[in-house]
A protein has these predicted regions:
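Short, hinge-like loop/turn segments at secondary-structure boundaries
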Residues: 92-94, 165-166, 243-245, 272-275
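Non-catalytic positions within long, well-ordered alpha-helices that form the structural scaffold/packing
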Residues: 67, 140, 184-185, 248, ...
């Protein structure tokens, strides 16, 4: 049986959550709660839900964990549905018919926990120019606060060129950057998630040239770049320290994103400490609350 969290939290209580992973479900026992004194990570706009098929935990559990961890603002940004042609089916994003339930759930939690935390409704999505206008039309039905760009594929997803695979083609990094910049030009995206996702095995010169172009654009247009803490805690090829050296030269705005797929990661203080060490070492301009942009054309 899953213990249901109380609707209001008594901040006088002390103790901790206990987490158990059983039969592909995340069980949370809300017993006594120990609120963390957290001054290094007060916002997180990169949070997923089970609707994307690779996250665990109930929406409420993410909110409870965020409050416990000391967050002041929690943004939900699950993987957006997309409108592909033909019979192509994307397995890592919510279905369009799940969106009303997602919206209703987040808005209900926003109202319920308004005295404890600020909750924002968003999506993480790619820029696929062939289908993007149809996606914006779909978004217009809902009170979405923001979307973030996570460019998981180059070109369109049906071509299966996953950005995180190792690419040795010398033009691949620039192809990725060109598509990202074209997407950012729409003015729809609040920030760029894991900007260094493209796993480039070509020449250092071509990597730096493309990264420099992306960072120059981001700096000029005040688009924050995310240090992705999922990549950090899972020891992936990103975040890439060399990429953020280039971002520092352009004085880019930097935001920390937990990229939480489990409630326990919604306030990842250990990774945040490492990310802040990067910011201090490189002189990066870290921001906590970006300007939220509604997903519509300029």
């Amino acid at each position: 049986m899953i213990a249901q969290p109380a609707k209001t939290i008594d901040r006088k209580l002390t103790g901790e959550y206990s987490w158990e992973w059983t039969k592909n479900e995340l069980y949370m026992k809300t017993e006594e709660i120990n609120f963390v004194e957290n001054k290094i990570l007060t916002t997180n706009f990169h949070t997923h839900t089970t609707r994307c098929n690779h996250a665990v935990g109930e929406d409420r559990q993410y909110v409870e964990a965020a409050i416990k961890g000391g967050l002041k603002v929690l943004g939900f940004s699950d993987h957006s549905p997309y409108f592909f042609s033909g019979d192509y089916y994307s397995t890592f994003r919510m279905k369009r018919e799940q969106v009303p339930g997602y919206v209703d759930s987040i808005l209900a939690l926003k109202k319920e926990y308004k005295d404890d935390i600020e909750i924002k409704l968003g999506f993480e999505t790619e820029y696929y120019p062939k289908y993007f206008d149809k996606l914006l039309e779909f978004y217009s039905q809902y009170p979405i606060d923001y979307i973030i760009m996570g460019q998981h594929f180059v070109l369109n997803e049906e071509e299966h060129i996953y950005s995180g695979d190792l690419h040795h083609e010398e033009d691949m990094m620039m192809r990725y950057v060109d598509q990202v910049i074209e997407g950012l030009e729409t003015g729809c995206f609040t920030y760029l998630a894991h900007p260094d996702l493209l796993n480039f095995g070509g020449s250092k010169e071509n990597y730096e040239k493309a990264a420099d172009e992306l960072c120059a654009y981001a700096a000029k247009n005040k688009v924050p770049l995310e240090i992705n803490m999922l990549g950090m805690r899972e020891h992936r090829h990103y975040p890439n320290f060399e990429f953020f050296k280039i971002a520092a030269r352009h004085n880019c705005d930097i935001i920390l994103g937990c990229d939480a797929h489990e409630p326990k990661d919604v306030c990842d203080l250990e990774s945040a400490k490492t990310a802040l060490e990067w910011c201090r070492e490189l002189g990066l301009n870290r921001i906590e609350y970006p300007e939220l942009k509604k997903p519509c054309r300029k």
